[in-house]
Amino acid sequence: MSRLLNDFNQSLHKGFIDKHISHKGNYTPKLLVNNKNEKVLSTIIDELQKCETFYFSVAFITESGLASLKAQLLDLSNKGVKGKILTSNYLGFNSPKMYGELLKLKNVEVRLTDIAGFHAKGYIFEHKDYSSMVIGSSNLTSNALKVNYEHNVLLSTMKNGDLVDSVKSEFDLLWQKSTPLTEQWINSYKESFEYRSLEKLAEVEQTQMLLADKVKKSVEIVPNLMQAEALRSLKAIRDKAKDKALIISATGTGKTILCALDVREVNPNKFLFIVHNEGILNRAKEEFKKVLPIKNDSDFGLLTGKHRDVDAKYLFATIQTLSRDDNFKQFDENEFDYIVFDEAHRSAASTYQRVFNYFKPKFMLGMTATPERSDELSIFELFDYNIAYEIRLQAALESDILCPFHYFGVTDYVHQGIKEDDVTKLRYLTSDERVNYIIQKTDYYGYSGEILQELIFVSSKKEAYDLADKLSSKGIKSVALTGDDSVNYRQIVIEKLKEGKINYIITVDLFNEGIDIPEVNQVVMLRPTESSIIFIQQLGRGLRKSSNKEYVTVIDFIGNYKTNYLIPIALSGDQSQNKDNYKKFLTNNDSINGVSTINFEEVAKKQIYNSLDAVSLNQNKLILKAYEEVENRLGHMPLLMDFIQQHSIDPSVIFSKFSNYYEFLVRYKKIDTLLTENESKNLVFFSRQIAPGLKRIDSLVLEELLKNELTYDELKNKMLNEVKDITEDDIDTSLRILDFSFYNAGIEKIYGSPIIERNERMIRLSDAFTNALSNQTFNMFLEDLIELSKYNNEKYQKGKNGLILYNKYSREDFSKIFNWNKNGSSVIMGYMIKSQEMPIFITYDKHEDISDSTKYEDEFLSQDELKWFTKSNRTLESKEVQKILSHRAKGIKMYIFVQKKDDDGIYFYYLGTAGYIEGSEKQDKMPNGSNVVTMDLALDKAVRDDIYRYLTN
């Protein structure tokens, strides 16, 4: 029986007969739902990436749903993979524009069935040796694929299986009777669709007219969940007699309404709202009018170059006008009970400071989307470090506050075989070929709504002007705007875009902030990402909700830029500087919540990987910058847990560059109190051995011994009674770690004196460590490291045999988890058989300069099979090899760990257990002529798609 057939048999047995069998089959039937950890969309994308052809039979398709697959479908087209989509016009649900989007898919043939009540939802994928299908309740819509509660099942069958034959036959039968999708059919359908739409619109308008008066009288704006939480926080700050607070909120998340709701709650005698832009000022005043009780219009006034409504209860002022001495000093310093600084990151500027320092309101609120931007005074210090609420991009999308988006990281234009890079000459950036390429990409990925209203961000003014000319010459109405243009001219151009009189505004950084164009339905980035903050600001230009769009399309042209690594940092909002996090983000189709999606064309994704591999994210300057940002937020020296709580750099990045955090602080003169050499070395031990949180028992044993000395039996009984899922061996290993007997001789040179001492009866803290505890500074660092250990341990909590699939481990970690007496780092050379365990550590891409005796060519044969080499100078008759070939009979378990390349350091992805495939062993030779044995190993569980792609690409 072939391995594939055997796997199918066991998978079906587990899925349909006995759920208790241990087989983790690659083809086990699986229920697909949308929840926090998995989405139906992910399975469909994974199947598309592996298939040789595909067939969709689905009744309802939306533009947004189709957009979530476009990057993958384009990659398939480039590989020559074709597919078919069968749909219909059932109930008039599908829009004519969506059908037009289907026609753009060059590798997909689309037909329409007129069968009555067509309500199918099936996705079929043909692979080399088998077929799979997703059948259930999900249409090809964003909500069905990512958000709604759906029931679908993933089924796999052999090529000759009856089920796939029946499904495919039914599809073929309908296909033959269906009508090919054409422009002519779409035009015909459009007429009837628009007629029905007008009828529906008339009904809606009539209903709205009947209800208008009642609604107008009864409507009161109430806070959403996030605003309600922020309002409670603001009240709590005032209840503590604090007079300043800061709201950090992504663009478009309703900061102004939130502020108005708080003002309504406080009901000040006089209120002042300060902003830098008159356009924003007028919109803010109108927002406040919606929320606050209006007695008469004179309650609301403006203080600008043209208006002087200084007696208004609610005064809205531009900083340019207010900051003049004769303007702000006409008011008493206590004139306003409540003052708001919009775009508060500007408050450090001298114009703002004059106003900020003059007025003494009962309460002052700062609002900003980017508090980190100031290069002058600390915004956090200005508002007394009182952060009332913070909502960033991911959370805002999850809460449906922002307009959903589909982000596409696309491959930039290649000029005569040379990809765009940091030094590309302007003439190539605006060449006819590149402009045509831009038009092709923006057309393929499309937009939501009836007309295109787009912002394009470029690198220079000249590029903006040249590109606008080129696009306009091709019939695409485009205007370049720069800082050289007057405010009045900018506003005229913006209004033209809003009204659909032009399609593109092209700029450099004019619209990074302070400009509100809700109608924008496509944002194009034609410049390298050099700042994650600016990236989010530019993306945010399209995220304000508007009636003209359901989503915004974001197209990022990714060239051969050194700073591409900033893209996953920006999109994920993850400031940890942890490369693994960013690589996982790139490969995870569920990386963002709601109906929004993040998609990369294959070549563009590789460009980002290359940038991530090349950049050093643990540079001293990056660590120092992260430190200063957190210090700036808190107003004092942060501890390691502060970096976690402030969503900043991962402490492990600090440890990769400095022996301990104290060493970093001393290096940059951030601490006055000095530790002894032994105390500092002890902190190195805790930073490397306890803080990673590999085994919770380590920190628990330490905490217990910090209280008092114990006998071994007392400690053992206490731990076994109070801690779940530990053994006496776990306790013994923890003690060996703490008394350093786990390590090789000479470890004291690195870690200082052992932490504990023990004899046949008692376990106690060592004298040196007891002396260290008398130092308050040492104690502070120790407690921080113990808390960090507990926090980090959460990711290791659910592991079988102490190991979790796809977590990363070192050889030393394995030694600890399996309670070896000694650290195996120096003796596990590729693999080692010890007791009943055989860890195998594989570096997939080896440096070309390694010796011929270690140039093993281990490789994946598939997602669940691996060609593996023993150590050199081994033959089929070697005792070690014979032991490996009979590992099942001897009860020896193989554990597979793989890293992509040596540059990944000491850590390897755990891919699960495996077994030797009988008959696959072979005597072979290394490049230097020495003997070696090769064999195929079968993983008990196929490697997850994203990890497999990362390791093998």
Model-derived regions: residue spans:
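Acidic, glycine-rich low-complexity segments with interspersed aromatic residues
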Residues: 670, 674-690, 696, 800-907
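PLD/PLD-like phosphodiesterase catalytic module centered on the HKD motif
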Residues: 1-224, 228
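Post-DEXD/H (motif II) to motif III coupling segment of the RecA-like Helicase ATP-binding lobe
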Residues: 345-406
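Conserved interdomain linker/interface between the two RecA-like ATPase lobes of SF2 helicase motors
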Residues: 387-455
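Walker A/P-loop
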Residues: 239-263
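Long, largely alpha-helical accessory region at the distal end of helicase-like NTP-driven motors
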Residues: 194-223, 443-444, 448-449, 453, ...
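Conserved helicase ATPase core of P-loop NTP-dependent helicases/translocases
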Residues: 282, 305-310, 327, 465-469, ...
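Conserved segment of the helicase C-terminal RecA-like domain
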Residues: 532-537, 541-571
